[in-house]
């Protein structure tokens, strides 16, 4: 039987990212190549470019952020679906490209872990991501060399991870997903192997990053009161503050007090200044309470849209790093009146759920059905600037809806179709997704032509819209995408750039290794001569010293192959010395060098 192709499940997060894959029918988290950190097996969604042009992703990027803040990019997810560009070393990058670098790392780590090539992925997105943001996420996957077979809402993925071993229980689940940049609250019903999303609500600009900022601002204000110096004007100081704020937030989830200690945070006329501040959990909770209170609105809205009350909720699932904070857990428990489930890792369950959905699509998991919903209503602008809905929010997807419209003026031969997303009654108050024209309508009195407008949402939540004149059969259709969506040609170009970038990275890594080997060999050669002293004949010693000088000169240049060749030559000479002048059984350095 042919081996089934693995589909990678990816949680592409604002602050951290993770991936999982089905092994033996169970989701397994892919470990980051750098090993576990304070984030567990996930890694920071961080990309950096060093002065010599090397790209770093994940923990290595985060570690150097203090010394290189202007070339370190974090929280790019908040810019997905926008026309924002990030400029680094004179080159502009779209949010899709930066996200693709993160996805490339995930792909590479997964391939190293599994020992096989990964081509397909399921990527999770916040339930409240609009069409533009979803399309941008798919583009990022394509640039990274992945076939994104499905986009899944993050809360839905978390519920998949939770329900895998409980397929005989009927229940109502509330998924409270508070990540680095977004809050999603989802009400789901589960029974008979079917997950059905009843409603979703949230805030795309509310998350753990806001908490970090609150702590950071507090530290900066306290320091300014004590010293008169505004640290927020110093990029490096801000980066150190941001890291310290996040670290304090994480530590205070399990301890009652922590010390922020940032020596040499800045330099004043009277010398260097240090920031040393003790923060208690009580102080942290005072700082973040206004942010936590904002979580009530989406919970109320989700229950209202599902036609349910707090008493109807059977289980509460927490997702996202900030939900580890006691203040967040207590707030949710008090709001619903039930304890939260504690058997799930909030940092890993989304990736695990994505892997399960990948298993469903690959045919590895049977009898599990996922019915997702569209988070916002979709429709068109009609006469008078009114927003006419064709698909109501929280409609199960995939779905297709049609409605008949007509002309607004006599002898009108074309109509403009303005597609919108939102909940406001007037078109101008909602998000514009795109426009197109249907032309060639035969002249007729207003209201006579019949124009059928059809909205078709696929399983990824991506929208196709068509308009058809029923009298002539003429039809115009478009796939709604962001105004800044990359064209197929641009995506191809970005893929090639990504491949080129990967090759450059490999070359740079090889160059670094060759230079390091050369330095190491010089050290070994000099130490060997020093240890053996007069045992080495003068002409042999001169030969080694000459090769060392030549290798040092080459290291100062750019001819990598010459460095490699000269290193091999020096290695051979030192090995000959080892064979000729070191007694058997000796542990002199040259015997070690020969084994390098």
UniProtKB/Swiss-Prot annotation:
CDD domains per record: ASKHA_NBD_HSP70_DnaK-like
Stored SUPFAM superfamilies: Actin-like ATPase domain, Heat shock protein 70kD (HSP70), C-terminal subdomain, Heat shock protein 70kD (HSP70), peptide-binding domain
A Pfam cross-reference name: HSP70
Keyword Transcription regulation part of the UniProt annotation: no
GO MF annotation: an example: ATP binding
InterPro entries: ATPase_NBD, Chaperone_DnaK, Heat_shock_70_CS, HSP70_C_sf, HSP70_peptide-bd_sf, Hsp_70_fam
Keywords: ATP-binding, Chaperone, Nucleotide-binding
Biological role: Acts as a chaperone.
Family membership: Belongs to the heat shock protein 70 family.
Protein name per its UniProtKB record: Chaperone protein DnaK
Provenance organism: Methanothermobacter thermautotrophicus (strain ATCC 29096 / DSM 1053 / JCM 10044 / NBRC 100330 / Delta H) (Methanobacterium thermoautotrophicum)
Underlying gene: dnaK
């Amino acid at each position: 039987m042919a081996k089934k192709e693995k589909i990678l499940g990816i949680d592409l997060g604002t602050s951290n990212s993770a991936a999982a894959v089905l092994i033996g029918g169970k989701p397994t988290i892919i470990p980051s190549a750098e090993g576990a950190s304070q984030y567990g097996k996930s890694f920071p969604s961080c990309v950096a470019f060093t002065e010599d042009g090397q790209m770093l992703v994940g923990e290595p990027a985060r570690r150097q952020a203090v010394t290189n803040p202007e070339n370190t990019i974090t929280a790019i997810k908040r810019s997905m679906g926008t026309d924002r560009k990030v400029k680094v070393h004179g080159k502009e990058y779209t949010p899709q490209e930066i996200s693709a670098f993160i996805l490339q790392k995930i792909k590479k780590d997964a391939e190293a872990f599994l020992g096989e090539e990964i081509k397909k992925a399921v990527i999770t997105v916040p339930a409240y991501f609009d069409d533009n943001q979803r399309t941008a996420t798919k583009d990022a996957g394509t640039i990274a060399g992945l076939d994104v077979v499905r986009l899944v809402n993050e809360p839905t993925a978390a519920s998949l991870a939770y329900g895998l071993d409980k397929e005989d229980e009927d229940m109502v689940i509330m998924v409270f997903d508070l990540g680095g940049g977004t809050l999603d609250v989802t009400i789901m019903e589960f029974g008979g192997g079917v997950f059905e999303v009843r409603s979703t609500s949230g805030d795309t600009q509310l998350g753990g990053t806001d908490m970090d900022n609150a702590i950071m601002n507090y530290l900066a204000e306290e320091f300014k009161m004590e010293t008169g110096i505004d640290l927020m004007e110093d990029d490096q100081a801000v980066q150190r503050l941001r890291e310290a704020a996040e670290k304090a937030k994480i530590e205070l989830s399990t301890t009652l007090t922590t010390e922020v200690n940032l020596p040499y945070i800045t330099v004043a006329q009277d010398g260097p200044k240090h920031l040393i501040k003790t923060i208690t959990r009580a102080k942290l909770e005072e700082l973040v309470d206004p942010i936590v209170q904002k979580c009530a609105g989406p919970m109320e809205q989700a229950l209202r849209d599902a036609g349910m009350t707090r008493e109807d909720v059977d289980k509460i699932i927490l997702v996202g790093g900030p939900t580890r904070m006691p203040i967040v857990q207590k707030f949710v428990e008090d709001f619903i009146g039930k304890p939260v489930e504690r058997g799930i890792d909030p940092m890993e369950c989304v990736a695990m759920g994505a892997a399960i959905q990948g298993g469903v699509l690959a045919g590895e998991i049977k009898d599990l059905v996922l019915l997702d919903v569209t988070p916002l209503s979709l429709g068109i602008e009609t006469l008078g600037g009114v927003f006419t809905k064709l698909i109501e929010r929280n409609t199960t997807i995939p779905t297709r809806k049609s409605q008949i419209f007509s002309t607004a003026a006599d002898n009108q031969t074309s109509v403009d179709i303005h597609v919108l997303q939102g909940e406001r009654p007037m078109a101008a108050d909602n998000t514009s997704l795109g426009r197109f024209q249907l032309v060639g309508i035969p002249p007729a009195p207003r209201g006579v032509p019949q124009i059928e407008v059809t909205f078709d949402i696929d399983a990824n939540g991506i929208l196709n819209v068509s308009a058809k004149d029923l009298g002539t059969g003429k039809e115009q259709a478009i796939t709604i995408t962001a105004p800044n969506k990359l064209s197929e040609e641009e995506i191809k170009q970005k893929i090639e750039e990504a491949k080129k970038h990967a090759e450059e990275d490999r070359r740079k890594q090889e160059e670094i290794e060759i230079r390091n080997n050369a330095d190491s060999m010089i050290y070994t050669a000099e130490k060997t001569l020093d240890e053996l002293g007069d045992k080495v004949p003068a002409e042999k010693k001169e030969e080694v010293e000459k090769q060392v000088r030549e290798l040092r000169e080459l290291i100062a240049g750019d001819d990598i192959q010459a460095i490699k060749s000269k290193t091999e030559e020096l290695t051979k000479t030192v090995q000959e010395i080892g064979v000729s002048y070191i007694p058997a059984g000796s542990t002199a350095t040259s015997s070690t060098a020969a084994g390098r």
